[in-house]
């Protein structure tokens, strides 16, 4: 574990730290720690997936990162500034979160109303709101949905409106908390593309707490939680080629890697791949 951390520090030595989590512990009942002395860094413009089984602590850490929970021990820094739980301004202005079920984020009659609500809370000048909402809606391709009743939207459309609401406030860090879990396959695929675009085109730092092993392959780095502690961190290619670790931690394989493994059992050798296009390209070149 220490070796993983040192390697990550060396690879990112010239990048600013977006989050520094230092020796954080948390307990809901003040007896049993859900997070136990957790430390890790996340760098600016990095896409990090946090994974682990139910009860591992991954959803709790997301709530600590956005200030919904106050750790009983440890410190949290964002872009070098220690977060005071008496003043959340620096945290609130730099971090946005999209939850598993976006319904709780909708309060207006239309999608546009819901996006505007977040801007009103930030006391944004009403004269520029329409331009901000339009720009945010273009990023996630929902301009045609702005005047529609939020309750009539599909799950995938609601998630895109929720993302637009976050983007409108222009945070540097965006956290997705199990955001693909309630979506159909098409919705999941659309959301995964948006996550990549936010990192690659909008230069956001993206953190995804997820059970979706196929999404994890898109990340720059994976952090694995178990029983309130980090047991492994590394690139997807490092994590998912370590079959001994996957077996010992009872983690599932992404579908595309299961398929690659099955091909190898049929004497069709392929390299590590993160999507079906890469896999098909390798297979076609072998013919």
UniProtKB/Swiss-Prot annotation:
Residue ranges annotated for the ABC transporter domain, each copy included: 19-252
Pfam families tied to this protein: ABC_tran
Xref: SUPFAM superfamilies: P-loop containing nucleoside triphosphate hydrolases
Keyword line: ATP-binding, Cell membrane, Membrane, Nucleotide-binding, Translocase, Transport
E.C. number: 7.-.-.-
Entry GO terms, CC: ATP-binding cassette (ABC) transporter complex
GO molecular function: ATP binding; ATP hydrolysis activity; ATPase-coupled transmembrane transporter activity
Main location: membrane
Membrane topology, as annotated: Peripheral membrane protein
Record-linked Gene3D superfamilies: P-loop containing nucleotide triphosphate hydrolases
Function, in words: ATP-binding (A) component of a common energy-coupling factor (ECF) ABC-transporter complex. Unlike classic ABC transporters this ECF transporter provides the energy necessary to transport a number of different substrates.
Family annotation (PANTHER family): ENERGY-COUPLING FACTOR TRANSPORTER ATP-BINDING PROTEIN ECFA1, HEAVY METAL TRANSPORTER
UniProt family annotation: Belongs to the ABC transporter superfamily. Energy-coupling factor EcfA family.
Protein name in UniProt: Energy-coupling factor transporter ATP-binding protein EcfA
Species the sequence originates in: Malacoplasma penetrans (strain HF-2)
């Amino acid at each position: 574990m220490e070796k993983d951390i040192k390697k990550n520090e060396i690879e990112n030595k010239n990048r600013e730290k977006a989050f520094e989590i230092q020796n954080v512990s948390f307990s809901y009942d003040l007896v049993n720690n859900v997070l136990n002395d957790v430390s890790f860094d996340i760098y600016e413009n990095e896409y990090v997936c946090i994974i682990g089984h139910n009860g591992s602590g991954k959803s709790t850490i997301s709530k600590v990162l956005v200030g919904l929970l106050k750790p009983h021990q440890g410190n949290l820094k964002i872009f070098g500034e220690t977060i005071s739980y008496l003043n959340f301004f620096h945290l609130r202005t730099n971090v946005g979160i999209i939850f598993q079920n976006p319904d709780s984020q909708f309060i207006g009659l239309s999608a546009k109303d819901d996006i505007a609500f977040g801007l009103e809370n930030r006391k944004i000048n009403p004269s520029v709101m329409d331009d901000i909402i339009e720009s945010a809606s273009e990023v996630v391709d929902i301009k045609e949905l702005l005047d529609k009743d939020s309750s009539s939207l599909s799950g995938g459309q609601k998630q895109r409106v929720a993302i637009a609401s976050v983007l409108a406030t222009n945070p540097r860090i965006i956290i997705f908390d199990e955001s693909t879990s309630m979506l159909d396959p098409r919705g999941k695929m659309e959301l995964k593309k948006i996550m990549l675009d936010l990192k690659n085109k909008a230069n956001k730092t993206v953190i995804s707490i997820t059970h979706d092993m196929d999404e994890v392959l898109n990340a720059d780095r994976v952090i694995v939680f178990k029983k309130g502690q980090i047991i492994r961190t590394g690139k997807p290619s490092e994590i998912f080629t370590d079959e001994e670790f996957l077996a010992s931690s009872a983690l599932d394989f992404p579908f595309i890697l299961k398929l690659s493994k099955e091909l190898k059992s049929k004497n069709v050798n392929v390299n590590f791949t993160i999507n079906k296009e890469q896999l098909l390209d390798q297979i076609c070149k072998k013919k």
